[in-house]
């Protein structure tokens, strides 16, 4: 079942996040603790929108988004989504995305933005769920 995220969900979300984004795939050493702290920062943002997927009182997936003004339009920016690895491929991610899509439509937002790695399963998943590459946008990084 999808429901609106609550503060007391964050520890479970941090654990899920640390398992869904292992060091060997993403190059970041996420622990349940530092992931929870990171997600808490997102949760506390003024325009935060978040949902969890729950079965039998256990959170199995979560999505963290922020509404933002982009020029003359308002969009929603998905910052993070994570599903327990052993539950991936069972429609949980799709349901979480649909919750954000429904929110966007209800609020009359212009669209939904997200960034992901070129890691093929993620790109294919998002394309399958209606997302497409945005022309002229690249991600740049500096140390």
Which ranges hold each PLM region?
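Conserved acetyl-CoA-binding loop-helix of GNAT-fold acetyltransferases
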Residues: 83, 89-102, 128
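Conserved beta-strand-loop-alpha-helix junction that forms the acyl-donor binding cleft
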Residues: 113-123, 141-143
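A short beta-loop-alpha structural element at the N-terminal edge
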Residues: 1-15
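Conserved GNAT acetyl-CoA-binding A-motif
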Residues: 97, 104-117
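Conserved GNAT-fold acetyl-CoA-binding loop/helix
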Residues: 18-40
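A conserved beta-turn-beta hairpin within the catalytic core of GNAT-like acetyltransferases
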Residues: 68-78, 88, 134-135
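Conserved beta-strand in the GNAT
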Residues: 52, 58-67, 77, 82
């Amino acid at each position: 079942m999808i429901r609106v995220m609550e503060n007391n969900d964050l520890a479970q979300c941090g654990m899920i996040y640390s398992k869904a984004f292992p060091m060997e795939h993403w190059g970041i050493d996420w622990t349940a603790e530092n992931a929870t702290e990171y997600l808490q920062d997102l949760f506390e943002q003024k325009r935060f929108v978040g949902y969890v997927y729950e079965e039998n009182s256990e959170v199995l997936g979560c999505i963290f988004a922020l509404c933002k003004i982009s020029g003359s339009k308002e969009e929603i920016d998905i910052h993070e989504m994570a599903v327990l690895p052993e539950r991936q491929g069972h429609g949980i991610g799709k349901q979480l995305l649909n919750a954000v899509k429904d929110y966007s439509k209800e609020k009359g937002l212009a669209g939904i933005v997200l960034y992901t790695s070129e890691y093929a399963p993620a790109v294919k998943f998002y394309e399958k769920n209606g997302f497409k590459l945005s022309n002229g946008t690249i991600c740049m990084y500096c140390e």
